Curated annotation (Swiss-Prot):
InterPro entries: Ribosomal_uL10 (IPR001790), Ribosomal_uL10-like_sf (IPR043141), Ribosomal_uL10_bac (IPR022973), Ribosomal_uL10_bac_type (IPR047865), Ribosomal_uL10_CS_bac (IPR002363). The keyword Ribonucleoprotein applies. It comes from the Bacteria. Part of the ribosomal stalk of the 50S ribosomal subunit. The N-terminus interacts with L11 and the large rRNA to form the base of the stalk. The C-terminus forms an elongated spine to which L12 dimers bind in a sequential fashion forming a multimeric L10(L12)X complex. Transmembrane segments: none annotated. This is Large ribosomal subunit protein uL10. GO terms for cellular component: large ribosomal subunit. GO terms for molecular function: large ribosomal subunit rRNA binding; structural constituent of ribosome. It holds the Pfam family Ribosomal_L10. GO terms for biological process: translation. It comes from Streptococcus pneumoniae (strain 70585).
Length: 166
């Protein structure tokens, strides 16, 4: 192999390792058997949630995982592999890929990493069942508003009872 090709591959390993280090979550899938139309729809959905989706050779993924400190992730790089990286939303790639796999049986989640820790297929699927960031924030807001609303209702009830008494 020429030195130019080796240098390009080494650069690609560095780029992928950088993406792995920076990613909040990584999901590895086997996308073999997806039609072009399904793949296009999947990529569009992922792009809409700011998730980067790439098909990369396993040898490059293994080396990048080792360089990123995710040595245990190398075991899922068997057979055709596509990788989804998300720097912001931890749940988005798992949720989108899991939802998509329900309609496209050819898509199979293999495993991944969550905030720098290797995750099994089961852990990724469990992550996919959680609500996304906006859903979690709305739940938090509801929990925070409930006591304030209850106090407001109690004050209103006291005021109404005093008006009735007067």
């Amino acid at each position: 192999m020429s030195e130019a090709i080796i240098a390009k591959k080494a650069e690609l390993v560095d780029v992928v390792a950088g993406k792995m280090k920076a990613a909040a979550s990584i999901v590895v899938v086997d996308a073999r058997g997806l039609t072009v139309e399904q793949d296009t729809v999947l990529r569009r959905e992922l792009r809409g949630s700011e998730v980067e989706y790439k098909v990369i050779k396993n040898s490059i993924l293994r080396r990048a995982a080792e360089k990123a400190g995710l040595e245990d992730l190398a075991s899922v790089f068997v057979g055709p592999s596509a990788v989804a990286f998300s720097n912001e939303d931890v749940i988005a790639p798992a949720k989108i890929l899991n939802d998509f796999s329900k309609n496209a049986e050819a898509l199979e989640i293999k495993g991944g990493a969550i905030e720098g820790a290797v995750a099994s297929k089961e852990e990724i699927l469990a992550l996919a069942t959680l609500p996304n960031r906006e859903g979690l924030l709305s739940m938090l807001l509801s929990v925070l508003q409930a006591p304030v609303r209850n106090v407001a209702l109690a004050v209103k009830a006291v005021a109404e009872s005093k008006e009735d008494a007067a």
